[in-house]
Design a protein with these regions (language model features):
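Alpha-helical transmembrane segments in multi-pass integral membrane proteins
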Residues: 2-15, 21-48, 64-77, 133-145, ...
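Membrane-interfacial loop-to-helix junctions in multi-pass inner-membrane proteins
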Residues: 9, 73-89, 110-118, 165
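Alpha-helical transmembrane segments and their helix-entry boundary regions
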Residues: 15, 78-79, 87, 156, ...
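Conserved beta-strand->loop/alpha-helix structural units within folded catalytic cores of enzymes
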Residues: 20-26, 59, 83, 87-92, ...
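His/acidic/aromatic-lined binding-pocket segments of jelly-roll/cupin-type domains
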Residues: 53-56, 223-224
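Central hydrophobic cores of alpha-helical transmembrane segments in multi-pass inner-membrane proteins
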Residues: 56-66
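Alpha-helical transmembrane spans of integral membrane proteins, capturing the lipid-embedded, hydrophobic core
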Residues: 83, 87-95, 161, 187, ...
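Membrane-interface helix-loop-helix regions
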Residues: 88-161, 191-206, 212, 279-293
């Protein structure tokens, strides 16, 4: 979800690779949602939603690294235009696929209520412009309180824009000490939200809806993750690197394990899940980013894995969910078990990865290149 790094600076290939690993886990996590009734009984990549917090930390780090020393001669308008060019083409693709999937489902809410096509189209338009659907409004076309019911995961792009705006207007102006204080305060907020059981499940699966405390939890997590990423970018050349042999594979394995961990409720103590998620977000994820930024690819296999997974990470995240809406409808209509549905689920993972690659090569990359040239010529 980040701008390409300046050619004059080294590229963090391992960070790109880890973003792709996390994106694939998000797809698997969303597949598992079709077979659970709550966050506590989801058994397939139970903590996959924490990948969004990992993405936010990555975004903060790469944006800080890319732009902290480049504001001389660059305006906020230029920065925000670059962010829009980076993010909006795949938002548009996700909206088109989401609207198409909704029509394929018969234009009905999950409870079976028919929705007029005009509201489906309006929901798509509002999603494109990152205007959330209020709970109970006609734009909330699925009846599931999603912020963006055309394509649910696009809620994180809403917070990505907020984080970019906060960086552009305020955070970049903070001293390193003030930024460290902001990060620490936000970390306490993250821990308080998770361990204090704000959601009812002692978890950080927040931000996807405007219902109750969910958007506030998303804002707190975004504030910490972006601030932590910005802070690490400032400190990276001042503090020791953590060079680990085979860093990409070790970090990828840790991410898979952390995001696949079952709901932590040992001895009937669900607050342990809040502690677990706080540790992951506040301590382990920043450490993994630091290790990845410290390392380099040293062989062709690792280089290919990082380049490919990094390339498809954002397109995959942005466009995979519409097909999962159809998957859910099929599973629930036929009362299928995972044992019966897994071949289709596996095909969806492979198909969405292929779709992400095709969209990147023949739509996203060419369009962004054209928009960037047009933006420069229009200055």
């Amino acid at each position: 979800m980040n701008d390409p790094l300046p050619h004059s600076k080294p590229h963090y290939h391992l960070i790109d690779g880890l973003r792709g690993v996390a994106a694939i886990i998000v797809v698997i996590y969303h597949l598992g949602e079709g077979f659970c009734t709550s966050p506590a009984d989801l058994w397939l990549a139970n903590h996959g939603y924490l990948a969004v917090q990992f993405f936010f930390i990555l975004s903060g780090f790469v944006l800080g690294y890319s732009y902290d020393d480049r504001w001389t001669g660059m305006t906020s308008r230029v920065f925000l235009r670059r962010r829009i060019i980076r993010l909006q083409p795949m938002v548009a693709a996700g909206v088109v696929l989401g609207v198409a999937a909704y029509f394929m489902q018969g234009s009905v809410t999950w409870s079976g209520e028919h929705i007029s096509p005009i509201w489906v189209v309006l929901a798509g338009i509002s999603t494109f412009f990152m205007i959330p659907a209020w709970v109970g409004s006609p734009l909330e076309i699925r009846g599931n309180a999603e912020m963006f019911p055309v394509n649910g995961p696009l809620w994180s792009l809403f917070f990505e824009y907020l984080g970019s705006l906060a960086y552009c207007l305020a955070i970049r102006r903070l001293s390193t000490r003030a930024l460290a204080c902001l990060t620490a305060v936000a970390a306490v907020g993250v821990g308080g939200f998770a361990i204090g059981n704000a959601t009812g499940y002692y978890h950080l699966g927040v931000g996807w809806s405007l219902s109750g405390v969910i958007p506030w939890g998303g804002a707190i997590c975004m504030l910490f993750c972006f601030s932590a990423g910005f802070l690490m970018a400032r400190l990276f050349n001042r503090l020791p690197r953590l060079e680990v042999r085979g860093a990409f594979w070790w970090c990828a394995a840790v991410i898979v394990i952390l995001l696949s961990m079952p709901y932590v409720d040992y001895g009937g103590c669900p607050w342990l899940n809040g502690i677990y998620e706080t540790i992951c977000v506040v301590f382990v994820f920043p450490l993994l980013v630091w290790i990845a930024a410290s390392g380099k690819t040293t062989d062709s296999v690792t280089t290919f894995a990082c380049n490919f997974s990094g390339d498809i990470s954002y397109p995959l995240y942005a466009v995979h969910y519409p097909s999962l809406y159809l998957f859910y409808a099929w599973v629930w209509a036929n009362n299928l078990t995972w044992g019966e549905a897994w071949p289709v689920a596996a095909a969806l993972v492979a198909g969405n990865i292929l779709l992400a690659w095709l969209l990147l090569k023949f739509y996203d990359a060419p369009l962004r290149k054209w928009l960037s040239r047009k933006g420069k010529s229009g200055r």
